Amino acid sequence: MKAILVFALIAISIISVNAGMMTGGSVEQDASQKEYSDKAWKAVKGINDQASNNGPYYYAPIKVTKASTQVVAGISTKLEVLVGESNCKKGELQAHEITSSNCQIKDGGSRALYQVTIWEKPWENFEQFTVEKIRDVTADEQF
């Protein structure tokens, strides 16, 4: 009886340790890493193509607030990105031309939170962006 109890405790311990390292599971990342900021800038076109940005100015990334990755026939990166109204007016340049050097965030401009999912298969030179607005953000809200 004592041997069965010891075996059960060891089995539970092994299962608990391995559950924290689930293969193929989503892994939280440090959202402040430059690679995630770069990915947010690459998603600018998708963010601005959303019908929810119907103002006269393009949105630009302010900050990546959350990041996670998952291995799924490539790598799926999920970002939560705070964006703000920039000083770049629609019609004066194309959304894919927006960069951090030519578009700055407007003081007092509108802000929103978007979820950006990037599916990458580097060996196939494949990259797919999915963008979804989460919600509008008030000017005094801190991240």
Curated annotation (Swiss-Prot):
* Recorded GO CC terms: cytoplasm; extracellular space; vesicle; yolk granule
Q: Which GO terms describe its molecular function?
A: cysteine-type endopeptidase inhibitor activity
The keyword Signal appears for this protein: yes
Could you say which residues form the signal peptide?
A: 1-19
Cystine bridges: 88-103
Instruction: Give the protein's biological function.
Output: Cysteine protease inhibitor which inhibits members of the peptidase C1 family. Does not inhibit asparaginyl endopeptidase. Required for the uptake and/or processing of yolk proteins during the development of oocytes, probably by regulating the catalytic activity of cysteine proteases cpl-1 and cpz-1. May play a protective role against exogenous cysteine proteases derived from soil bacteria or fungi, or rotting fruits and vegetation.
Q: Indicate what this protein is called per its UniProt record.
A: Cystatin cpi-2
* Gene symbol of the encoding locus: cpi-2
